[in-house]
Each structure stands twice: as C-alpha cells, then as structure tokens.
Amino acid sequence: MARITVEDCLDHVDNRFELVIVGTKRARQLAVQGKTPMVPEENDKPTVIALREIEEGFIDASILDEKDEPQDTLIMGDADHSLDLGMHNSPEA
C-alpha cells in the first residue's frame, strides 16, 4: 500500500486542522459505530482507513454536519424493554 500524505488529503478538505477533525470523526464511525468502510480494509486500522477514504474523495467535510449516533440509546432501550416484559431482577418474597 502506498503512503497516505497530508497533501493528497488536502485536495478534499480545507486545511490540515479540518483533516484531523474529519479523519477522527470517520475513524470513530468505523471503529465504534460499525460503519462499513468505503475502501478495502487491507488489515488497516480505522484511522488509516478513514484517511484513505478522504484521499480517494469518498469522505469530505460534509461528514461534520452529520449527527452522531448516541451510544447509550441501545443500552437504555434494552433495559426499558426488559422492564416492560417483567424481566427485571426482583427478590422473591
């Protein structure tokens, strides 16, 4: 795999500071939210995959306008659902 350079990525974002923010957000989407990579993974870490996506023009600063998916929603939703079904743990009297 060829090296990813900042200069190649800057063709798709305004400056290196925005590159860091865009790359970070996309890497989190890949690692934490389970988003599907737009480039072959090739055994790369999420940060490298994010930079490759930026370099190839699949990801740009518009990603910053997307709302993040809350991580606690699923956990709380499962807890509420189990309470509704009477599946909560209560001591027997």
From Swiss-Prot:
GO terms for cellular component: DNA-directed RNA polymerase complex. It catalyses: RNA(n) + a ribonucleoside 5'-triphosphate = RNA(n+1) + diphosphate. The RNAP catalytic core consists of 2 alpha, 1 beta, 1 beta' and 1 omega subunit. When a sigma factor is associated with the core the holoenzyme is formed, which can initiate transcription. The keyword Coiled coil does not apply. Promotes RNA polymerase assembly. Latches the N- and C-terminal regions of the beta' subunit thereby facilitating its interaction with the beta and alpha subunits. Belongs to the RNA polymerase subunit omega family. This is DNA-directed RNA polymerase subunit omega. Its EC number is 2.7.7.6. It holds the Pfam family RNA_pol_Rpb6. GO terms for molecular function: DNA binding; DNA-directed RNA polymerase activity. InterPro entries: DNA-dir_RNA_pol_omega, Pol_omega/Rpo6/RPB6, RPB6/omega-like_sf. GO terms for biological process: DNA-templated transcription. Keywords: DNA-directed RNA polymerase, Nucleotidyltransferase, Transcription, Transferase. It comes from the Bacteria.
